[in-house]
């Protein structure tokens, strides 16, 4: 082939390449669709069956890779949604509570609330659930006058060791003399808030006025700081783990001396003139005011209603037999607690240790009333 022929041939090749390239970059699908046309009359230029093997393979490769990424993202999304759902799913009673484990005692009330005894709850399930919730639990305690020096340090020290281990805890300590509060070193996740309260002339008024004080603190700050709140007497000491099995909307404590007695034998307030009045023939259990709790809003309602009854009695010049405890029992008769704690959670060793008390969680201190209630 002469030189002129070679030049013409080269120009034809270059022109062909340019045309091919121009068709490629202007193709809406980004491939060599316009090079290959099917001879099948049923397949027109816009058919997905048109194409060249290399760009078709390349595009399919990209498509498959992108599809895999999309599938992976969707799967991750589903897993994240499932995780969030698992974290927020309400824990059902029968997921963690087995009343048949303690057939010798009352484990379920007439209104289907659990009575928590050692052995009836699955600690692992409860801990797993509440750990995901990242809860904070509050604990209020009053130490007035000599109660500070006789009981406060041992109460808080034992609570630091056994109360809601592994979860955030705020101790709300109410005293009449901040200068007497001992230094107590707390563990991780624990904090200590001290508040000075006005002292009362009589110990009965101290006991009753705590309902007003707790309610005021819940409204002022506690409701924004904790998920659950317990209110306890200071003359007690923790003996074993007092954990998340005790948490609930409203929680009442069985009184150790009365948990086997007939309701007509309970020391309820029996005078009709009192706002705490409970007639014979009524009553479920006798509840101990040394421990009660629940969500902040429920505890607020408990304290406000009890204090209303106390004020009404004062107006009528009457005082309930067991003061705030009488009003608490009247409240729980009308507003059934969602959970009840067995006497194991507040035991008096003076009773002895019967076979149904498996593990004492919290015990009464020796009541030195002549000492601590003399000019408190």
From Swiss-Prot:
Its EC number is 2.4.1.87. Keywords: Glycoprotein, Glycosyltransferase, Golgi apparatus, Manganese, Membrane, Metal-binding, Signal-anchor, Transferase, Transmembrane, Transmembrane helix. Mn(2+) binds at residues 233, 235. Its cofactor is Mn(2+). The active site is at residue 325. InterPro entries: Glyco_trans_6, Nucleotide-diphossugar_trans. One of its GO terms (molecular function) is metal ion binding. SUPFAM superfamilies: Nucleotide-diphospho-sugar transferases. It is an enzyme of class 2 (transferase). It is a single-pass type II membrane protein. The keyword Transferase applies. Pathway: Protein modification; protein glycosylation. Residues 28-376 are lumenal. The chain crosses the membrane at residues 7-27. One of its GO terms (cellular component) is vesicle. It catalyses: a beta-D-galactosyl-(1->4)-N-acetyl-beta-D-glucosaminyl derivative + UDP-alpha-D-galactose = an alpha-D-galactosyl-(1->3)-beta-D-galactosyl-(1->4)-N-acetyl-beta-D-glucosaminyl derivative + UDP + H(+). The keyword RNA-binding does not apply. Residues 1-6 are cytoplasmic. Binds 1 Mn(2+) ion per subunit. It is found in: Golgi apparatus, Golgi stack membrane. Belongs to the glycosyltransferase 6 family. The conserved DXD motif is involved in cofactor binding. The manganese ion interacts with the beta-phosphate group of UDP and may also have a role in catalysis. Synthesizes the galactose-alpha(1,3)-galactose group by catalyzing the transfer of a galactose residue, with an alpha-1,3 linkage, on terminal lactosaminide (Gal-beta-1,4-GlcNAc-R) disaccharide borne by a glycoprotein or a glycolipid. Preferentially glycosylates proteins, can synthesize galactose-alpha(1,3)-galactose on glycoproteins but cannot synthesize the glycolipid called isoglobotrihexosylceramide or isogloboside 3 (iGb3). This is N-acetyllactosaminide alpha-1,3-galactosyltransferase. It comes from Callithrix jacchus (White-tufted-ear marmoset).
